[in-house]
């Protein structure tokens, strides 16, 4: 009887051990892989003079590494808090340029980093260059692509703040840009999973009845408000194509930066407190200011 019981026990033990083995992701068969992993048609940027067509290439699917990145959902945003860029950002892996006047095949843009994650493309006013960002393990870098020489170079390190959208604005002289950067005064984010609440979250409607739209990923408490502030604060610096930089505007929660047609004025918008717990960041109180190209406020 004991001997008969031994075999089922051994079988069950071996089954449990095999089921606990760590299994890695598997690559499908070649036929299936070729069917799924088809190169997408490139995204196109074309200048107004019909001289250059910039072709942006990306993978059909995000990598497991990209999907496993940290994500913070706050104020209607989904942000990678360690890199200050949207966690759902579409990244491009290659850039080619087609000369519409004399080329039938696109030319490779030279000088791009190895395994790049490119985004935030902005063409210069004279349409001869494109500014773009490259996201690395350290953060977001600024790169410039010259459409005449078909070469790219990095001009600013891993400190760009892309939390509230594209951080790049060209100035009209085609030699300078305004970029949003992470301030040195930033504070560590609050980890909600490691703290005990000290009180309830309270909202008031002053006794009024009103319809209210619902949104995802809103600010829910003071800790969320603190984290949103730290992620959104940025300085605006002026930088040349040679990488020379100087401070333009001090730290605020800048949403947008735009330049007047003659290039003499810069208008910025920035978010102000108090934050709403009912709507996303783009419906928060916003102030607009106009500055001279020198950084002096226009009164």
Model-derived features: positions:
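Sec-dependent signal peptide recognition
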Residues: 2-9
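Beta-propeller folds
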Residues: 7, 19-299
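Generic N-terminal leader/processing signal
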Residues: 1-2, 20
